[in-house]
């Protein structure tokens, strides 16, 4: 408990100063409603373009934080910024990743163009803004890819019209001060309502059975939506990779339900799952869901990297580059000072020799262990074992980032 308290204190201290300096007053710039952007992204590793297919008035209150409007993390391959048209000031920002980022690293994606859906939920502005869709350049800097003018007084908006069958599973308070999680239940018919209730409960308790989510249970609201998210196994040729390409349909199902994070629960006992940062997480009902769901939520919620090794994946060289990985829990030692170096016990060797005697259910001492981000060499992780690698709890480095994310939604 003492260690968790220290981690939380450090996380809040780091965010506090920067947040106060950049404070955006919600009532000055925003109506209190929600603007939904349905975007299309098409391309390959050779290049891509992005455009807005639909502007939608979600006809619901803004359920995100009204005080933490600027994303303090340099995480995610993409970012959306809303800029006041008069002053140019950034009044809202969030980093995220998407399926296209993974597609372009596959053999097909290196040359063959494909189109992908994205959905962004933004606070509805009171006056004209410019919405910048940003991506990483060759040096990993965020640059504008396209800038979309939006004036709420003249924009032609569509409206949210449908929603799946909703259940309020566990609600602890004002959505603007909670982490709002929507569990979308796929594969349930009208005859399986009792099973659906049992499965909702199981998934909810799996998540709240792991730290730091257990200690933050009161900081969550959890909702259920029954409907077909069109998630499918075999994404990008990996049998266990269970994802959906139908982002617009997914958000149609969610409708006006408060939503910061999405978990797709697939009524299938075949092993599978997947997740993308600030996009969604997926888990089947396989017996290993006890580990799959928290692991995938770590990707979606915290932007954490996989720490396991799988050289057969087409993107196994993803992090062996001249630039430090974006994810906080892996490093290629290009800029280790920006990672967990300050958390290491004095005298820790870098790299740290492996300790094969560490039980797989324990993290072991903090260090710099080779083998992470799918690569057996050249990429390093903070602990022998971690939820992002195998069957241990989240390690201290992952816990620190997860605590920091909570502060974006609960303050």
Question: How should each PLM-predicted stretch be described?
Answer:
Residues 5-15:
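Sec-dependent N-terminal signal peptides
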Residues 155-211, 224-228:
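Fold-level signature of zinc-dependent metallopeptidase catalytic domains
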Residues 22-117:
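N-terminal prosegments of processed precursors
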Residues 110-175:
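Extended acidic/polar, glycine-enriched regions
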Residues 291-307:
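Active-site recognition of the HExxH zinc-binding catalytic motif
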Residues 219-277:
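Active-site-proximal segments of metallohydrolase catalytic domains
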Residues 195, 273-296:
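Short pre-active-site segment immediately N-terminal to the catalytic Zn-binding motif
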